[in-house]
């Protein structure tokens, strides 16, 4: 199965030259570290691409990456795994890691499904960055929606049973949406405090209690559960920003953050 890019030329440059130029200009230049997982934003690159590239370029991107993001369209299963084939990117097609996909869908938690992915942007905008940083990367795209904390933990356990030391989990999430900059910074700070504390329960309680529209809170919770099972004790915030710094509109912003979950 071949997934044609849905937002190429809209959320990120269509041409490989422009995409490469953007990525190369925003590389962190920091020494590469080994990570269990990273959290990257997924808005248009003009708004959140700097944060995504800055964070991803600090990490050694292995050949196997599991991408987990929110399902914005409502199509498909609650946990939808793209099973096989490849995804179009400006740098050539990114192959699906069908072996890992099969291991995930062998569980009752996950469903082999393409409907959830056809028009979903949350993972697509990240794939070109990964493909540029490691041309040999193979991806397992997973979207999710409406999961309880218990299901997130169960998914974390599944990931721990499937992933080896050469697998990176990438969480796709923006932070709070469409409030003023002050409110967004306050809400984002509270959610990020839970993320950095590696506390998936606190993240769920905080997001719900403070009405924080962090669209990737569910995959973030699953990743935190996974990382703790793999022995993670440190999460690092690489950058926290919002769309107002680009648009000039501080009355209605979206927050973005990059996080590295260290081995």
Predicted regions and their residues:
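A short catalytic or substrate-binding loop motif that flags glycine-/basic-rich loops and adjacent residues
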Residues: 250-253
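Short beta-strand scaffold segments in enzyme catalytic cores
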Residues: 256-261
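Active-site histidine-anchored catalytic micro-motif
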Residues: 1-234, 238-243, 247, 262
């Amino acid at each position: 199965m071949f997934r044609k890019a849905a937002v190429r030329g809209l959320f990120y440059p269509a041409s490989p030259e422009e995409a490469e130029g953007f990525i190369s200009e925003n590389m962190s230049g920091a020494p590469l570290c080994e990570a269990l997982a990273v959290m990257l934003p997924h808005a248009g690159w003009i708004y959140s691409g700097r944060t995504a590239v800055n964070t991803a370029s600090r990490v050694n991107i292995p050949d196997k990456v599991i991408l987990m993001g929110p399902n914005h369209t409502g199509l498909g299963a609650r946990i939808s795994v793209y099973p096989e084939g490849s995804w179009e990117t400006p740098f050539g097609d990114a192959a699906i890691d069908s072996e890992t996909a099969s291991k995930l869908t062998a569980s009752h938690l996950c469903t082999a499904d393409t409907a959830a992915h056809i028009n979903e942007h949350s993972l697509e905008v990240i794939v070109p960055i990964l493909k540029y940083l490691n041309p040999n990367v193979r991806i397992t795209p997973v979207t999710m929606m409406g999961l309880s904390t218990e299901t997130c933990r169960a998914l974390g356990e599944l990931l721990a049973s499937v992933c080896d030391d050469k697998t990176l989990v990438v969480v796709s999430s923006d932070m709070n949406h469409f409030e003023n900059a002050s409110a967004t910074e306050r809400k984002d700070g509270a959610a990020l405090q839970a993320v950095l504390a590696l506390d998936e329960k606190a993240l769920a309680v905080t997001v719900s209690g403070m009405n924080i529209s962090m669209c990737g809170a569910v995959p973030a919770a699953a990743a935190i559960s996974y990382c703790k099972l793999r022995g993670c004790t440190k999460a690092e915030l690489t950058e926290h920003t919002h769309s107002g710094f680009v648009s000039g509109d501080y009355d209605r912003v979206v927050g973005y953050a990059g996080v590295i979950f260290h081995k």
